[in-house]
Structure formats: structure tokens, C-alpha cells
């Protein structure tokens, strides 16, 4: 069996690194994609049944501005896609953790797994190696996002009819965008500080901090603070008003 160093010497291209990383990561990617798909498909009917029978909701569930902190208004919950937007806001947390943890794992592997496999960089250099890792991250994000969006779409068709396709695309599309943003942050952090032995803990703390910043900025109404968190870029109730993302956050 050829090891990575011999493959690099023979071919010396980005795709070699990508194929190698893909073989090592595909099980991790497929588990994430399948888990997200099963969870969203199972939770959509449960939450829709709760809205249809409001007496089952906790008495103070709608008080205290809770829904506003996740970008959903109470009135919007009565719309066909309102509850999906509520669920999507929390699944975005999982997407952010996946993206950042996967990126950190790719770029800190030499430290966390005590391996020197990427010290043999003469055939193609670090730039090609990094390109291969980033390509693996992009493919992994596409697969998990496709599984999540497809399961969401099927569940919405089965359990909730009459929804707007444009609004659904905007809501569901925020999941891969959040995943990519946190994945990019993981790439930058992994390149800057590769000696990270706790990539999962780092990713979880970063995503949770981003969520707290967004919730805090919405609570006090501070737009300046909202720029510090990727979750602020995708406010669900605005999709139903302007029918697009707020481009100012991407400038």
C-alpha cells in the first residue's frame, strides 16, 4: 500500500492530498450528514404538532423574547415555514460545529495524531497540501448540507404543504453558509495555531460564543455587536420581508 509520501512524489498535485483526506474523513462526513438528516426529518413533525396544539406548549414558552433571540417572531411561527426557521436556527449551531471542527481536524492533524505525514512537502509544497485540505472541507460541507436540505424538503412536503419555495431555499441555504463561514474560521485558526489538541472543544466554544453574541445583540438591539457573529448574518424573519440575505454583512 502506497503511503502519502510516495503518492506525493509520484503525482505531486492537490488532488492527491484531497483523495487521501477524503478516504480518512468520509466516514466522519457521512455520519454527520446522516445524523443531521434523520434529526431534522424527525423533529419537523413533532414541532409542527406542538404549534397546532398550543395547549401542549409550556405556559411561559412564548414570553421573555426567546424567539426574537433566534431571529423568529411569534407571528412568524404561525406561517408554514416559521417553525422550520426556528429549528434551522438551532441546526445552524450543529453546522457551525461540524464546519469548524472538520477544518481544525484537517489542519491540526500532525499535532493531534502525532503524525509527520505532511512533513514530506517537497514534491508539491504546503500550498498544494492546504488546497487539498480546503477542497476536502468544501466537499464535506456540500455533502452534509445536501443531506440536511434534502431531508428538510422531504419533511416539509410530507408534513406541511403550501410553503414558498423561495423562502425555503433562503432558510435552508443559511445552513451551508454558516457551515462554510465557521469552516473558514477553522482553516485560518488551524493555519495560525496548528498545535491545537482539542479541536472539538475549540469549535464548540467558538460556535457557542457566536450564538451568545447574536442573541445578546438582538436583545439589546445593537447592530454593531451583531457584526461579530456569523449567526447574525442570517435572520430568519427578514427572509420573509426582503426575500434575500442582508448583503451588508458580507461586505
Where would I find each of the regions flagged by the language model?
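Helix-loop-helix units of permease transmembrane domains in multi-pass membrane transporters
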Residues: 106-138
Amino acid at each position: 500500500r502506497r503511503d502519502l509520501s510516495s503518492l506525493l512524489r509520484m503525482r505531486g498535485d492537490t488532488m492527491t492530498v484531497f483523495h487521501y483526506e477524503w478516504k480518512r474523513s468520509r466516514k466522519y462526513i457521512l455520519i454527520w450528514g446522516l445524523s443531521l438528516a434523520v434529526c431534522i426529518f424527525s423533529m419537523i413533525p413533532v414541532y409542527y404538532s406542538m404549534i397546532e396544539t398550543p395547549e401542549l406548549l409550556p405556559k411561559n414558552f412564548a414570553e421573555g423574547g426567546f424567539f426574537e433571540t433566534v431571529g423568529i417572531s411569534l407571528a412568524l411561527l404561525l406561517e408554514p415555514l416559521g417553525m422550520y426557521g426556528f429549528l434551522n436556527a438551532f441546526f445552524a449551531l450543529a453546522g457551525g460545529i461540524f464546519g469548524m471542527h472538520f477544518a481544525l481536524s484537517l489542519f491540526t492533524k500532525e499535532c493531534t495524531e502525532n503524525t509527520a505525514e505532511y512533513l514530506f512537502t517537497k514534491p508539491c509544497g504546503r500550498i498544494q497540501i492546504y488546497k487539498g485540505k480546503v477542497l476536502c472541507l468544501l466537499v464535506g460541507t456540500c455533502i452534509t448540507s445536501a443531506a440536511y436540505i434534502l431531508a428538510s424538503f422531504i419533511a416539509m412536503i410530507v408534513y406541511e404543504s403550501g410553503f414558498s419555495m423561495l423562502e425555503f431555499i433562503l432558510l435552508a441555504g443559511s445552513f451551508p453558509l454558516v457551515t462554510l463561514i465557521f469552516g473558514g474560521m477553522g482553516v485560518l485558526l488551524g493555519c495560525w495555531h496548528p498545535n491545537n489538541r482539542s479541536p472539538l472543544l475549540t469549535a464548540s466554544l467558538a460556535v457557542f460564543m457566536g450564538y451568545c453574541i447574536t442573541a445578546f445583540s438582538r436583545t439589546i438591539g445593537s447592530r454593531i455587536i451583531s457584526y461579530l457573529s456569523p449567526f447574525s448574518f442570517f435572520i430568519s424573519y427578514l427572509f420573509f420581508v426582503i426575500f434575500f440575505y442582508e448583503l451588508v454583512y458580507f461586505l
